Amino acid sequence: MNRKITDKLATGMFGLCAAIIAAILVGLFSYIIINGVSQLSFQFITTKSSAIAAGGGIRDQLFNSFYILFITMLITIPLGVGGGVFMAEYAPNNKVTDFIRTCIEVLSSLPSIVIGMFGLLMFVNLTGWGYTIIGGALALTVFNLPVMVRVTEDAIRSVPKDLKEASLALGVSRWHTVKTVLIPSAIPSIITGAILASGRVFGEAAALLFTAGLTTPRLNFTEWNPFSETSPLNIFRPAETLAVHIWNVNTQGMIPDAEAIANGGSAVLVISVLVFNLAARWLGTMIYKKLTAN
């Protein structure tokens, strides 16, 4: 077969695959938005949910989702980046290191329901905390930490060796080289990994069913003392997230407008993840320019 024809066929096949993937994503996104846009309003977002009466909102669930996301990433990012840097730069090249990498890959592929059961045993029953925000955040940290470690390790290893060798040749210590050369160069990839991990956290439901619970106590958004039982910042209270609320409304909800609430919540969930990802990518670019003086 003529080389030009073969090249055109291959290009066409790749383009077709890309078009199919794009069509699926656009179709799914459009379906969720179209079904939920009629429910979206300021009142819907700022009103607390209702267990029986129609017209409830998603205020508490939306706050819980972002709050658990914040706490989870507050734990995951330092540990994940530190672990990834160690695996890339300090860990010896031996069978123990290879075994650790294998364990990380296995842990990253565990179903979220398994992580939820582990969290139920460890952070709910064993600690005696019950269903709490911190229990859900720790379970999601177990869920996301292997991904963050692997992404950071790959990002550090992708930095050109010439940069590292030039820094070391000037007599700079390994730690200073990591801090001023490797990490700034790997920041875009690390930020991308953090974004992917954040998206998984924000949309997670199975693990949080067993750790953060299906209920949210009456919250007082004027009470910011984290030790108060009614404070939204209290990490030892149960917290139904938006993803869990959507599942709960669809399967166990008794409200007459359950379908509308679920559609509206799904639209908010998708839009929130999209906006968060765009903002995080912009932030990653700004940090990279600042650290590299570009």
From Swiss-Prot:
Q: What does this protein do?
A: Part of the binding-protein-dependent transport system YqgGHIJK. Probably responsible for the translocation of the substrate across the membrane.
Q: How does it sit in the membrane?
A: Multi-pass membrane protein
Q: What is this protein called?
A: Probable ABC transporter permease protein YqgI
GO BP terms in the entry:
phosphate ion transmembrane transport
The gene name reads yqgI
- Principal localisation: membrane
Q: Which UniProt keywords apply?
A: Cell membrane, Membrane, Transmembrane, Transmembrane helix, Transport
A GO CC term assigned to this protein in UniProt: plasma membrane
Q: Which residues form the ABC transmembrane type-1 domain?
A: 62-280
**Where would you find the membrane-spanning parts of this chain?**
14-34, 66-86, 99-121, 126-148, 190-210, 260-280
